[in-house]
Amino acid sequence: MSREETAGAPARVAALEDEIERLRAEVKAWKDLVAALPVREGVEFTNLSDMPLEPAYTALDLAQGPTADGMPGSYPYTRGIHPTMYRGRLWTMRQFAGFGTARDTNARYKFLLARGQTGLSVAFDFPTLMGYDSDHPRSEGEVGKCGVAISSLADMEDLFAGIPLDQVSTSMTINGPAAIIFCFYVAAAEKQGVPISKLQGTIQNDILKE
């Protein structure tokens, strides 16, 4: 902080305190008004998590427990996982991609990475999303469409062949088979000599997605 900024700090604090007092008076006047008006009886107002909702929120509510947010790069990571946020590192650039066989998609990933993409986002085909192998009768006509077909560890190895998994983060959009796909990914990384502690990315575990 510069000397000028330090010198002006008391004035800014005083102005902020005045603004808080003004807002408190405004909130009190509003609550007095609401108390005189009829409301629906027997109705509970909650959000989707069934938590009760106040009639209105203001900046004053932010002052209730601000220390719980922590600092950028520190637990509980409410303010991001990077200490410098996006000033020191841009967000990951990744195109949702996947089609045909694992080798087809592998070539696409290498194409994207060579042109500046900084992460991978795997699109799986419908049989993979539903947990069916490519040779299952229910997979007929859907293999490799709208995503890559992954039926085995060998497929996962082909998908990331020549792509060092300790140097790229991977986002995988999957349904119920998430646990199996994750194990495939970890095993493929280990075969590259990459320990699980060096892996980056996310995996979706949403059985209602498709």
Predicted segments with their positions:
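Catalytic alpha/beta active-site cores
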Residues: S2-E210
